[in-house]
Amino acid sequence: MKSSAELRKIFLDYFRHQSHEIVPSGPLVPANDPTLLFTNAGMVQFKEVFLGREVRAYHRAASAQRCVRAGGKHNDLENVGYTARHHTFFEMLGNFSFGDYFKREAIGYAWELLTEVLKLPPERLWVTVFKEDDEAANIWLQEIGVSPERFSRCGAEDNFWSMGETGPCGPCSEIFYDHGPEIEGGPPGSPEQEGDRYTEIWNLVFMQYDRGKEGRLSPLPRPSVDTGMGLERLAAVMQGVHDNYNIDLFRNLIAAITALSGIQNQEQTSLRVIADHIRSCVFLIVDGIQPSNEGRGYVLRRIIRRAIRHGHKLGLRDPFFYRLVEPLVQEMGEAYPELFRLQSQVERVLKLEEERFNETLEQGLKILEQDIIDLSDAVIPGETIFRLYDTFGFPVDLTADIARERKLTLDMKGFEQAMAKQRKRARAASRFKIEYGSELQMDLETEFTGYEQLRGEGQIAALFRLAETMETVEQLSAGESGMVVLDRTPFYAEAGGQVGDRGTLRGSNGLFNVTDTHKQGAAHVHLGEVRLGQLRVGDSIQSEVDRKYRTPTRLNHSATHLLHAALREVLGEGVIQKGSLVASDRLRFDFSHLEAVQSGQLRQIEHLVNAKIRANLPVETQIMPLQQALDAGVMALFGEKYGEQVRVLRMGDFSMELCGGTHVDRTGDIGLFKIINEMGVAAGIRRIEAVTGEAALSWVEEGEVCLEALMGRLKASRNSAVDKLEQLQQQTRQQEKELQRLKAKLATTGGADLSIQAQEIRGIKVLAARIDGVDSKTLRATVDQLKGKLITAAVVLGTVVEDKVVLIAGVTNNATSRIKAGDLVNFVAEQVGGRGGGRPDMAQAGGRNPDKLDAALDLVPKWVEGQLTSGAQ
């Protein structure tokens, strides 16, 4: 019996021998594709190649691609655990042809691998083709020799694939495995096809058409092939099991969960859910996703919390999910070495998320259980779903999971209405910023010369005027704002976090002031205003970058690379860049880290960066193939799209990253690096802001001026200033304590005097009074003192603090059956525009109308008498 790891290797080795380039799995975060939450198929990393927008050095490829289907259009989350073949994470084995081989070879490869290499019996395989694809049908029936009795033609719904409403598309051919007549279900294309007897294991897509806007299909000049075979499904077939959760990959994970829970029934849904979810969660975190409340991070949080809830069902009340990382690493680490490297980081993320959710899970489940008991029908109300989501962090699919187990449904319309109300409450006025060139389409290319020089000659290739919209023009005149596209330029276009250059474009008839530079496709777009004369398309231009703006930007960009490397050295390899801003006045770097960076760590990071600056390391760039760079250990950012050839930036042996930005020649050019701020920007994301060069020197000098002023005020030296300040703080704290003691003593004395004002009503001494000049703490102490003195009493005291009413009510324990402190304090609070609450014996409230306090307190005896009278009846 072959293991999943062996099957993965057999597949890739087979296609390597068929002259395919073996391409490593792309990240789970698709590069530059906002239409996808996650990579969900093997072809995703080749999408630009299939669309003809990217050219690679090879024309045939194969890969084992990590995929996630959870959230968005492709969402298997709700079915995971309940079926034999649904997963949030899976591996897609695929071979691809980019205008090289087509149907005959693709079909031949698939059949040979399945029947001759893997030795699957042909009589257990079933083949389908698109009903109109006679070419594929003839290859299968006439050349391969598939039996007509194990072959069917199907409609477009099952056997015609499209990338979208328009673009590349074509028929597909699917290969199914027959598990035998003892399993219910009929062959593909039959009325009984929904059964489990026949399992699709390989899909061969033949991209041979281009669908136009009108729906017309035109033949592609170079047809391509995209195939996909789920490793888990193949393993189930090869290991003789009908259920994916019985393959080796899952058996070992389920055994680990069983060991933690003590549950021996390995068919339990919860075991399967947890085993599936640990795979997707670990790989998402490895690929740089952190749990959060939006986008991909929220999908990860939903998966984690669903797993935790199923652990709760198994009796696992303490954090357990993170303990499954190690068995997963042992299972898949050989194929994906990054699992070993980032294991501790992943464990920390999962443990922290689990601890956070455990705080509210129990409480939320109790509320849901009570609401289910109170149901008048089989529908959980939308308000309940929203309350669990908003207050207790229950993703909707977690509530749906529980409903499914109880044979209940969800009022999703009511939930959406509650969500809409919340969004309306939270909606703030916003302005839409016009993005220059955001909707422009241009087929232009600019040669960038700015690595070597800040001046250059070029020719105007296109002009755009900014009116209500951006419009193409032949001429721009003085006072007009717009964009200039040159055939070559030294101006750096904003990318990789580095801001675009500023400067001037000077022609024989005009001067253009550049305020920013952006990239539109392959063109550099200069934004700004004509200051003198006019510019025309075709004019020769003298370009000059603002040196005072570019130079500090270069310093900051190089310092950002040093900072990134220093963070990974000090905090660990779990640090992953999440964003950056490289401007002329500062740099900003966002990175994954679960907690605030300690002050000692910040000093260590800063010292390390400055040590590398003093070392004056050479800053070198080299153009090389992407895979060569990755093999050399170059850091690449998840979610970034790179071409086949990349620019590698090296700073000695300390830092090596892919980068297209502008940099110093040696690290010593940076001069000085100073961290000025560290803060959190989202769950698991920290931000460091820093300055370099002259800006760093100015920051230090400003600090010196402040320190000297402080020393003067304290009448202390540099070395004694901190001690002197601590002494003053200690004195202040002691004086504040003494002040509070005196206030309490004064209030207690006043309380003794107040006790004589109490009037007895039906056996309870009632006192309502105002005490000025005290805080809530003193007021509470006075109420306690009066309760002790009056024996059987109801007391409410009020004061005014910063124009707000503070009320404290107290009722002795022997009277709480007749009157409640919460009711008493709320009665007074309503008179002064507020409300409050608390225990039957002690409650607190506030109010907005201090001028009504005295009148409100005067009403207390009558209110108490009414309460006692009604209670007696």
Curated annotation (Swiss-Prot):
Q: Which keywords fit this entry according to its UniProt record?
A: Aminoacyl-tRNA synthetase, ATP-binding, Cytoplasm, Ligase, Metal-binding, Nucleotide-binding, Protein biosynthesis, RNA-binding, tRNA-binding, Zinc
List of residues binding Zn(2+): 557, 561, 659, 663
| Necessary cofactors | Zn(2+)
First-tier enzyme category under EC: ligase
Chief localization class?
Answer: cytoplasm
Q: What Enzyme Commission number(s) apply to this enzyme?
A: 6.1.1.7
Describe how the cofactor binds: Binds 1 zinc ion per subunit.
Q: What does this protein do?
A: Catalyzes the attachment of alanine to tRNA(Ala) in a two-step reaction: alanine is first activated by ATP to form Ala-AMP and then transferred to the acceptor end of tRNA(Ala). Also edits incorrectly charged Ser-tRNA(Ala) and Gly-tRNA(Ala) via its editing domain.
Concerning PANTHER family, the annotation shows: ALANINE--TRNA LIGASE, CYTOPLASMIC, ALANYL-TRNA SYNTHETASE
The record's NCBIfam families line, in alphabetical order, gives: alaS (TIGR00344)
Q: What name does UniProt use for this protein? A: Alanine--tRNA ligase
Per the UniProt record, the source organism is Nitrosococcus oceani (strain ATCC 19707 / BCRC 17464 / JCM 30415 / NCIMB 11848 / C-107)
From the UniProt record, report the name of the gene that encodes this protein.
Answer: alaS
